[in-house]
Structure formats: C-alpha cells, structure tokens
Regions:
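Active-site and adjacent substrate-binding regions of carbohydrate-active enzymes
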Residues: 1-325, 330-352
C-alpha cells in the first residue's frame, strides 16, 4: 500500500537503503538472506504492475559478487544497483597511475541487460567504501592507498570483524582533496585534470551516472565541521549557502564555476551521443598500465566511442586501431590519428 500510494503521488524511484540487512535471523549475520531477496522480488512485482513503472535501486555496500546478486538470478529484483567498486578502484588508478586493477575489474564486470543498470558514482555523502575493492586491491595496495588519502587530508572509518579485529570500511575525504596530490605529482599540478577525467570515465561508463552535489563545485574537505562534530563523514558534507554559491557560479574564473561548467559539459556531450546509452555495449581494451581505455557501441551499432584516459602525469603514446584516423574528439571536434599522445591525465572521447 505504501509503495502504491507513493507511486500514485509521483515517486518514480525507490532507493532501498542498506537493504541487505533487512531480514533478521537468529544465528546468522543477518546479511544477504534469501528472505531479503524474496521481499525485493515482491516489491519489483508491485512496481511492474503500476502504470508509472517506478524503479527500484538497492544500496548494498558489499563485495562485488554479493552486490551483483541484487539484480536477481532472473533479473527480477532491483532495476539498478550502485556500482560500488568503481569509486575506490578509479581513484586508486589515478593516485598510483596504474590501470591494472581498474582494468581487471572492468573486464570482469558483466554487461547489464535492457531494464537493468549500474548506477555509477565516485562520491557520495558517505565515504569511499573499501569493501567493494576486496579481491582487487591487496593489503599492500590498500595500505599505500590509505596512506596517500590521509596525506591528502582524509580520515579512515573502521568496522569490526568477528567482534575483534578491525578493517577499514571507508575513507572519508572529498574528491577534491583525494585527487589533490600523488606520489608522482607531489605539488598537485594536475589535480584539476585528474578530477575532470575521473568524472569523464564515470559518465562514459556503462550505466547511469550520479554526481554528488558537492562534487559539482570542487568542494574541499570541511575540516572546521569535522573538528566541531568529530564525525568523520562531515568532512564530505559541506553545507552551502544558496546565495553565496550562486554568486560564485556567476564568476567565470571562480573555482566553483570552473569545476561546475567542466562537469556540465561532460553531461551535455553524453546526452548527445547514443553510444553513451546506459546499456550500450562496453568493451575494455588493454593499453598498458598508464592508460585506461574502453569502447562503447550504440545499441543500433552505428556509433562507436573510445574513452581513452591517460592516468599518468606525463605525456603517453597510445596506438589504437588504424580506423581511428576517421574519428573525432568529442571535446573539441578535432580529428585524431590512431597514434595518440594524450596530455597528462587527459581523457579523450573519440567517436566515428
């Protein structure tokens, strides 16, 4: 009755927060129980029966295999699931100029079927979840990752394992601070390029992009709020004054205006190209650890777009299919040779 009433009053998306813990059973860990999946199936049946066809999104910050299970064996559970592995692996790839783990994950990630989608994001009001990186980043990778994030102003939140030892559950930091400096770019010369390219990958990837409000403006850590509250998540929960933000956006060269318009441009280009359809085919291409590359092909197979990202703080040489010479970069409409030399942390969207 609640679902039907809300849908009849205009609700089009139902987000099921931490739904994996819904069903409680004595003697179990009360996570991912079959009863929880059955309830989601029932909710899906209700949504499918309504004229407005509302969408169900499950929020399950878990290792990837468990997260994927919420599509249902017969695609009969959630319409969309959060792509939780993307944030830690994408951020790690830029900070360490290494596509190895991101590429492995991308190649293993199953394609979605029409009606199902990944909800892609790289920041939220919570921290950067680390459980979804399990199986891709080993202890040494994680230790170096945490060390760099802390150097950039981040904090770490922990979870207890079997009531005894503790593991990092999430890193609390804004994207602005996370991308600010790396071991290869200690002065932060290319932090803006890292920031925008990370969003370009997320927006171009198979699925539907979701951009955290504060990320639109390159918002930095709210250290003042964290000192007062002691809540690590407050680092990434800055509250804007509406009038102040609007005034900053009117200034062409303000930090907020620069970040905002660059990200808006990515969204504008995405909307114009059918190879960026949420279910358009995705193929990962191995171009060496300094490059992250994937190809999107439209559902009608008429448009192909290559996303080519230089993860390095140095110029890189990339050789693609010779047919690339007929392609253009969607950012500036320039034609490109199959021999590419992307700038430090530059992303190219090459379309036929």
């Amino acid at each position: 009755k609640i679902i039907i009433n809300l849908a009849n009053n205009g609700v089009t998306i139902f987000r099921l927060d931490a739904i994996a813990y819904l069903w409680k059973k004595s003697g179990s860990q009360c996570v991912n129980l079959k009863e929880t999946h059955e309830i989601i199936k029932l909710l899906r049946i209700v949504c499918n029966s309504l004229k407005s066809k509302p969408i169900i999104i499950t929020e399950t910050n878990l290792p990837e295999k468990e997260n994927l299970s919420y599509f249902g064996v017969k695609n009969d559970e959630s319409h969309w699931i959060y792509n939780f592995s993307l944030p830690p692996l994408l951020i790690h790839s830029f900070l360490f100029e290494d596509s190895t783990h991101l590429n492995k994950w991308s190649k293993n990630l199953p394609m979605t079927k029409i009606g199902n989608n990944y909800l892609n994001f790289i920041a939220s009001h919570d921290g950067i979840g680390m459980r979804p990186a399990e199986g891709y980043l080993n202890k040494d990778n994680l230790w170096k990752f945490f060390k760099r994030l802390k150097k950039n102003g981040g904090q770490l939140s922990y979870r207890k394992v079997q009531g005894k030892s503790k593991k990092v559950y999430e890193a609390n930091i804004t994207l602005f601070n996370a991308f600010q400096k790396t071991d290869y770019d200690k002065k932060g010369k290319y932090f803006l390029e890292r920031y925008i390219s990370a969003h370009a990958i997320m927006i171009a990837f198979e699925g539907i992009p979701a951009i955290y409000f504060n990320s639109l403006f390159g918002t930095s850590n709210d250290d003042y709020k964290y000192i007062i509250s002691g809540n690590k998540r407050d680092l990434n929960r800055y509250k804007w004054n509406k009038d102040r933000l609007e005034n900053l956006l009117k200034k062409k060269y303000s930090k907020q205006s620069i970040f905002y318009h660059k990200i808006l441009n990515l969204i504008f280009i995405k909307k114009q190209n059918k190879a960026f359809h949420p279910n358009a085919h995705r193929e990962s291409l191995n171009m060496g650890k300094k490059i992250f590359c994937f190809k999107r092909t439209s559902l009608d197979k008429k448009q192909v777009i290559y996303n080519v990202t230089n993860l390095s703080s140095k110029f890189q040489r990339v050789i693609l299919d010779h047919k690339i010479e007929k392609y253009k970069n969607l950012f500036d409409k320039s034609k490109k040779s199959h021999k590419l030399i992307p700038k430090p942390h530059e992303t190219l969207w090459l379309s036929n």
